[in-house]
Structures are given as structure tokens and as C-alpha cells.
Curated annotation (Swiss-Prot):
Keywords: Hydrolase, Manganese
The family this protein is said to belong to: Belongs to the metallo-dependent hydrolases superfamily. Adenine deaminase family.
Organism: Methanobrevibacter smithii (strain ATCC 35061 / DSM 861 / OCM 144 / PS)
Lineage: Archaea, Methanobacteriati, Methanobacteriota, Methanomada group, Methanobacteria
Transmembrane stretches, start-end: none
Gene Ontology MF annotations: adenine deaminase activity
UniProt cross-references to HAMAP family, sorted A to Z: Adenine_deamin
SUPFAM superfamilies on file: Composite domain of metallo-dependent hydrolases (SSF51338), Metallo-dependent hydrolases (SSF51556)
EC numbers on record: 3.5.4.2
BP term (GO), one: adenine catabolic process
UniProt xrefs under Gene3D superfamilies: Metal-dependent hydrolases
Cofactor: Mn(2+)
Reactions it catalyzes: adenine + H2O + H(+) = hypoxanthine + NH4(+)
Protein name: Adenine deaminase
Length: 571
């Protein structure tokens, strides 16, 4: 196949007309040409390399890899570096093998980073354990391009033997190591990076990202469903101040400074966790457009999802050059970025209207071993007339929480929530046969009635539930048990849910059906008073102990700064 078109050369940062030859799924020849008029070209618009999401957990879309691919190609995405950390916590190597095999059923490039922290910590119950020897074998797979995010930064800093052994396996094979180091700085950051950990996607402010970048880390700018860091990291005034304070500022001609200001400074744009309700509206194409709105140059933004991740992970895609796999998209222009066609290995997979491949239904043995619950399971006892309690404060669009305190009344020996002050109940129910339950309090949801529950609860994916009363919490959890996973919302006799029977994380359903059901749940939660844009996703991160400041696992309330359990009721 041969055609002529304008193409974006991400190696030279330029756009020019070229004759492009594709053979056997690879670019055979790229020849710049001279034209008198655009009508001489075979294809109108601009040819770009296919987009690469270099850090995403497919399970967070609630879709199988194949269903994800069917949706993503509509938006110009042809490749992902995915970390199957979620299903690995549920089902270990069987879960990882499922993701790899399912990904092979569709024309799309799935590269895998091997989960490094299963379980994420020793302070929670997961469905599996991946030790250093197992990780070493998984890293030898052809599909494995990196060691997944090292969330146990205390283990790295303190020289934990097993943690360091996992890192050594990646070093021996010459594979990059992804990081996870929220708010880590100074000497602790130096120790962390000394172990060859080369990326971070957890930066939530410009100063944090700059420190890591200047020390040699590659920064992933995250724009997901729950965590959105692009505005903070692409802030124009911060970029301007950075370059003004740069040692070379006084030597820069004005035209050079003007160009520098529109460079992103950082390296990749990633999703991390993306709900289907957001994904059906767009993927990296929308993130690129947002970056452009934040005054990042279009070519630089596109390079953050093409050649930059390709180079870092040693992928044979990400640029339109001889010998690389012919993954490319046709767009109308660099600003509107409307996807006209998408190609993978030289074959059209999206023609502007329809996806040109089918997805078959798949099965996976579930892991849901938990007994039905009663309202009494969600009570916190106290003999005093009131109790001073620790409270988790969550924020819209953020994974980070804050620790707060509240004084709550007791009734019949149980501590009561305070709906007027938005102090609700939260609990985590272990789903792997132990049936343990930890209860606590949370603020930020603003529910005025009912309860919501989820079997998506990072990272061990036990059941997490937030509610205004114990009875609705029990019923919401029992609904999930009946469905073998998913999301549920309950208020008295009212009940609605989205079943996720594949490991309690995913479904075979079409993306638009999933999105429609989830949107309905979001609307119901809003009708119940919830102010969060993505309440189920926000709730799912309340059990993620590796992100500060206070979270909850099936073993209790947890101080993520000092890595220790704390009492719900203060002494």
C-alpha cells in the first residue's frame, strides 16, 4: 500500500507532504515530496503516529482488553502500556494471563508492565501474592516491557530485601521500572530514584514534578477520571516562572523563550484510571486538546503520547519512520484533532464511523468468597454518650485525602453518622474468604440517604461501601455478593447495580451499555445528594493505602504517612 499525505514527523518536529509506503504491517518507505496544491495528495488531513497511553489500568474502564480496544481506536489510540495490577491482586498470574490472552484477540497493541506490588501493602488482604521470583518469570514474557509502578516506596527507601529483589529482576533484563511516589521529595526521593525507578505519574503540583524531573525522572502527566493533574502540571504561569528562573534565561533570544514557554517540560500524558463514562467521550485525543488549551504546543502534546513513550519503553511504534509498525491516524488538523481514520499494522480498524473488528465474549473464573452481611456488621460500638473520631476527608477528582476529626453522638451503644455535617460511614469487607470488616467515617460524599458499594477498591479489591446507615450498607454489599462484583446503590427497598462478573472488575458488555448503566448510578447518587463527579471511582481509592494521607483497608483505618493503623475512636 502506498499513499501521499501531510504527515507529522515527531523526530524533527515538523509537518510536510510525503509518499508513505506500507508493507507487511510496517512502514517500508517515507519520502518527502514537493506538491503544488493539496489536491495532489491521496489523503486529506494530517497523518499522525497512533497514540500510546503509557500508563493505564484497563480494569478501571470495567471493560475487557478487547472491549477497551474497540472503543479506544475511535479516538486514535493504537497502543497502551497497561499494568494489570488490579486483576493480579484478585487472581494473581491467572489474571495476568487472562489479560494477555484476551488482548491478542483484537488488532491493537497491548504492552504490559508487570505488577510489582501484589499485594500493594501487607496491611490489607488480597487474592494473591506475586513474589520476586514470580515477577522475574513474568518479566520474561514477550508482552512485558517494564516493571509496573513500585508503590511500596517505604520498602525501597528502607532497603526491604524482597522489594529490592523485584527491582533487580527488571534491571537484569534491562526493562524500565515505573514509579509511584506521591509527594516524595528530598533525600527519600534520591534513595527511591537510586534504584533505577524512572517514571512517576503521581505528581499533583508543579513544584513536585519539577523536583523529580530535574533529578532525572520522566514525568507522566495524569488526566484520568478521578485524578486530573494536567491543569496543575501544565499551568502557564508556572511554566513562565520556571523558564524565567532558569539559569539560561538571560541568554535566551525572545523567540527561543517564546517557544520554550509552550513546551510542556514533562514527558508523557497518561490516563492511569479511566471510567467508561469518560472514555466514550474521548481518550488521549481529548487530553491532547486540553493540553493545547493550556498553551502547550500541539506537536509537543502529540509527542507526549507517541515518540516519547515509544522511546522510553522501546516500542516498535510511535513514529512514522521506516521499519516501525504502521500504526497511524488521520486527523483533520492538529487543533481540533478529529479522528478520521485509525490504522493498526497498516490495516484500517476505524473508518470514521465504524470499528472494523468484532469482540467475542470471554469468561474468567471469579473470586468472590464472602458471606451475606447484616446491619450490625457496620456498627461501631462506644459506651460513652459521644465519641471523638478520626475521619477521612476525600476530594472531588483527587486520590489524596486528609485526616480530620469529629465528635459524633452515640445511640444504643453505637456511634452515629452526622448527615448535616456530612460525616458518613465507610467500611471495607474482605472478599477472599476471611469475611473481616473494618468500619470508619468519611466526609466529602454528601449523601443524604442510602448507601453505595463497589467491589472495585484499589488495590486489593475488597468491597468498599459508603452510607448514611448500616442497613442500607448491608443491603448494598449483599447486592454485590449476588452479582459477584460491580457497583450498587441502595435506599430502603430501592436498589440498582452494575454487575462486573469478571474478577469483580470487568464485564463483557459493550462500552456504551456499561457507560449508560454507570451514568444512571451516578445520577441516582447525585439525587441522593452526592457532590462527587465519579463517586464510585473516588470511593474505590479510599482503600488505596499507598496514597496519603488516611485510608481504610479490611484490617482497619490506616495512616498512610506513618504506615500504621490508627483507631477510629480517638483515645
Amino acid at each position: 500500500m502506498q499513499f501521499s499525505a501531510y504527515m507529522l514527523d515527531v523526530i524533527t518536529d515538523s509537518i510536510y507532504p510525503a509518499r508513505i509506503s506500507v508493507e507487511g504491517g510496517f512502514f517500508k518507505e517515507i519520502v518527502p515530496i514537493v506538491i503544488n496544491d493539496d489536491s495532489e495528495l491521496d489523503i486529506s488531513g494530517i497523518i499522525l503516529p497512533g497514540f500510546i497511553d503509557s500508563h493505564i489500568h484497563i480494569e478501571s474502564t470495567m471493560l475487557t482488553p478487547a472491549q477497551f480496544a474497540k472503543l479506544a481506536v475511535r479516538f486514535g489510540t493504537t497502543s497502551v502500556v497497561c499494568d494489570p495490577h488490579e486483576i493480579a491482586n484478585v487472581a494473581g498470574t491467572d489474571g495476568i494471563d487472562f489479560m494477555i490472552e484476551n488482548s491478542k484477540s483484537v488488532p491493537f497493541n497491548f504492552y504490559f508492565s508487570i505488577p510489582s506490588c501484589v499485594p500493594a501493602t501487607c496491611f490489607e488482604t488480597s487474592g494473591a501474592i506475586l513474589d520476586s521470583e514470580t515477577i522475574g518469570e513474568l518479566l520474561k514474557k514477550d508482552e512485558a516491557v517494564a516493571l509496573g509502578e513500585m508503590m511500596n516506596f517505604p520498602g525501597v527507601i528502607n532497603g526491604d530485601g524482597e522489594v529490592l529483589a523485584k527491582l533487580e529482576k527488571a534491571k537484569e533484563l534491562g526493562k524500565p521500572i515505573d514509579g509511584h511516589a506521591p509527594l516524595l521529595s528530598g533525600k527519600d526521593l534520591d534513595k527511591y530514584m537510586a534504584e533505577h525507578i524512572s517514571t512517576d505519574h503521581e505528581c499533583s503540583n508543579f513544584a513536585e514534578a519539577i523536583e523529580k524531573k530535574e533529578k532525572g525522572m520522566k514525568i507522566m502527566v495524569r488526566e484520568g477520571s478521578s485524578a486530573k493533574n494536567m491543569e496543575a502540571l501544565f499551568d502557564f504561569s508556572d511554566r513562565l516562572d520556571y523558564w524565567k528562573n532558569h539559569e539560561s534565561f538571560g541568554k535566551m533570544p525572545n523567540e527561543v523563550l517564546e517557544k520554550r514557554i509552550h513546551l510542556p517540560i514533562f514527558d508523557f500524558i497518561v490516563s492511569d484510571d479511566k471510567h467508561t463514562t469518560d472514555l466514550i467521550k474521548g481518550h488521549l485525543n481529548e487530553s491532547i486538546k486540553k493540553a493545547i488549551d493550556l498553551e502547550v504546543s500541539p506537536i509537543s502534546a502529540i509527542e507526549m503520547v507517541t515518540v516519547n513513550p515509544s522511546t522510553h519503553y522501546n516500542l516498535n511504534t510511535g513514529a512514522i519512520v521506516k521499519g516501525m509498525q504502521a500504526d497511524y491516524v488521520v486527523v483533520d488538523n492538529l487543533n481540533d484533532l478529529n479522528i478520521l481514520k485509525t490504522y493498526v499494522a497498516g490495516k484500517c480498524v476505524f473508518d470514521g464511523e465504524n470499528v472494523l473488528f468484532d469482540v467475542e465474549e470471554t469468561e474468567f473464573k471469579n473470586t468472590f468468597d464472602v458471606s451475606k452481611k447484616e446491619s450490625e456488621d457496620f456498627e461501631i460500638s462506644c459506651d460513652e454518650p459521644s465519641a471523638d473520631v478520626n475521619v477521612i476527608r476525600c476530594f472531588n477528582g483527587e486520590l489524596i485525602t486528609e485526616a480530620e476529626s469529629a465528635t459524633l453522638e452515640t445511640k444504643k451503644g453505637f456511634v452515629q453518622p452526622d448527615l448535616e455535617e456530612d460525616i458518613l460511614k465507610i467500611a471495607v469487607v474482605e472478599r477472599y474468604g476471611g469475611n473481616s470488616i473494618a468500619n470508619g467515617f468519611i466526609t466529602g460524599f454528601n449523601l443524604k440517604k442510602g448507601a453505595i458499594a463497589s467491589s472495585v477498591a484499589h488495590d486489593s479489591h475488597n468491597i468498599v461501601v459508603v452510607g448514611t446507615n448500616s442497613e442500607d450498607m448491608a443491603n448494598a454489599v449483599n447486592c454485590l455478593i449476588d452479582n459477584e462484583g460491580g457497583f450498587a446503590i441502595v435506599d430502603g427497598d430501592f436498589e440498582d447495580s452494575l454487575a462486573l462478573p469478571i474478577a469483580g472488575l470487568m464485564t463483557n458488555e459493550d462500552s456504551h451499555e456499561v457507560a449508560e448503566k454507570l451514568e444512571k448510578l451516578h445520577k441516582t447518587a447525585a439525587d441522593f445528594g452526592c457532590k462527587l463527579d465519579s463517586p464510585f471511582m473516588t470511593m474505590s481509592f479510599m482503600a488505596l493505602l499507598v496514597i496519603p494521607a488516611i485510608k481504610i483497608s479490611d484490617k482497619g483505618l490506616f495512616d498512610c504517612i506513618n504506615f500504621e493503623f490508627i483507631d477510629v475512636i480517638k483515645n
